[in-house]
């Protein structure tokens, strides 16, 4: 496929995103993993797209995000960039693409920028990841942090559950947010953090955009998993998701109708296939003799 025709809007940039924050205009952010979905998200006016390692679950059928590889992420991000040339695209650093060392983190962040045309990268973790953030930013790559529920370490956190409900844990998240900001993160995603904890972090942010995924309305913007919006992930529906339309039901209905029409010889109809003229068909039969 070729690159989608760009929308007329100007592509969001770091300055324009910070201007939205200054003007109290919430930032819209969705996950995306493929060309056609990226095209529609750009046409809808979504500010940012996250090519999340959640693709391991939503697109590849794994039970966690851990199996996603850098090659998986690059290939899907390339498709998204072609579909949304005028949208701010963020590449999600997959498991073990940044944890081993600062050098590994910089190298893989660079792949997102050079091979996939990303505008920024995101990685999970708190204070322990500040040196990775700092190294990536020093290399000239915009970097986002991710706190609260961090799916790559969900097992250590006790599963997919709210983080920061206790005062001590909430304090650690607040401290980590400030540390990531000081390390150079321009955005921090708070996933499944209590709303008032998110509000405290947002109010304390000086030069950092705070985004919410299930963390309430007080952040500078919202992120949702695209498949959750339309009932496209059959294994479970997160409480934090809002279903804006059940595309899964529509797709299933269409698939069942297709199977029924083929098995009963009602598809294809004349408008669904191509024919050869009688003259050319007669010539073909003569050639075959």
Predicted regions and their residues:
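Alpha/beta enzyme core
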Residues: 2-289
